[in-house]
Amino acid sequence: MMIIDSQVHIWAPETAEKPYARGDAATPHRPIPLGHEELLREMDNAGVARCVLVPPTWEADRNDTSLEAARLYPDRFRVMGRLAVQKPESRALMATWTN
């Protein structure tokens, strides 16, 4: 039986170039960011074959960390991205999100 986790968060460290969202956004689940390599080890240990990455709220509308993981490991990760639907530039992004 294949196990697929339907909601997993990975995130990068907060930096000046990529600050976390403020206000109503949640805070990270733990003080150390969770990257895709660590997640793959955890998935393998738990017998999870694939997962859907959902960018966390504290990364606002950024999807880059999750998209990069899916690009590197397309057989393991898919992304349910976050888009600011009120922004016109988000429409252009929709055309690239086919897989």
What are these regions (language model features)?
Residues 1-99:
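Helix-coil boundary/capping segments in enzymes
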